[in-house]
Amino acid sequence: MVYILELKTTQAAAMKIVTDAINSLLTDANFDFYPYYIEEGEESDDESKNSDTDNDYESESDDADSDSSNEDSDSEQYIKKKITKKNSKANAKSKPNKNSDKPEEKAGEEKKKTIGGVVLKEVNKTGKILVYMRLDADKFDVYKYNYHKKKLTLGIDIGNLLKCLKCMSHFDTMSWLVDDEDINKLIVVLESVERKEKKTFKLNLMDIEEETYDITPIQFPYSITLPSPDFHKYCKDMAGSTDKIEIKATSKKLFFSGKGEIGNVEFEVGETNGGLQIVSTTSNTNEIVQGLFELKFLLIFTKCTNLCNQVTLFLKNDYPIIVTYQIAALGEIKLVLSPSKAD
């Protein structure tokens, strides 16, 4: 038995939390797995002719300003979707490279290398939300990529994956494996050394049309960081009064407001040590940015609250909002929501 993919982490609880959040937004998705190291300018064999996905990991991991929207929104010009003729299983059906466990650095090698890992990038069925998740290879306890191509794509039913992860205990170790003799299944293993337990699931993989998204990098005026429990509470409290929430930011304050049957509601939050922090990324510190968003989606985003202590928001006039959470020590998830039209 040879595994073309083998990863293991003790951060299993964080993976369950983020999978639960993604399950509320996507029914299924393609997970792209990259080698431990990615060389700058490296292209896959035949795939590079059809898509730019081989550079997805490197470009997206450094891009905090990506955004998405559906085709009917005002921000449609900032994302274009391409559908390839490949599917996830076809992409996996090939011989493993048994010598590419973890690329060895050659003496005198000058090519710049970046850390690879796992990428999920999908727009949900409403067309209003882009989900982007990145898990870094060097943050896993074990990350072995033995596939002969530069990318391995697996189509995974998110609901079925969540069912497996819900069987874990808090301190379980989670492993994902793909056997070269049974490449149509993802093996999920949950282990507890203390209880001497081992639970193994073999998930059927899906044929999902592979989609790529061209996302224009955008500079947002403000990077807004606040405690993730606070953001969850503001959204939850607002939900009792309104269906849509307006988020407005200045260089010093953050405002949440809405209208409903009870009337108008507004929360004003100022900067504090250990609390709200607003960083201006432009020379114009007097700029006011705001956007109107559907609260039900922001509430789904807050399912990620327990992943980290702080959440970061990127806000710009007439643009989608980006809500970013760190996935424990593994990576990050960016949830991008298109603005809503006023009633």
Identify the residue ranges that each predicted region occupies.
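DNA polymerase sliding clamps and clamp-related checkpoint/processivity subunits
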Residues: 1-241, 246-343
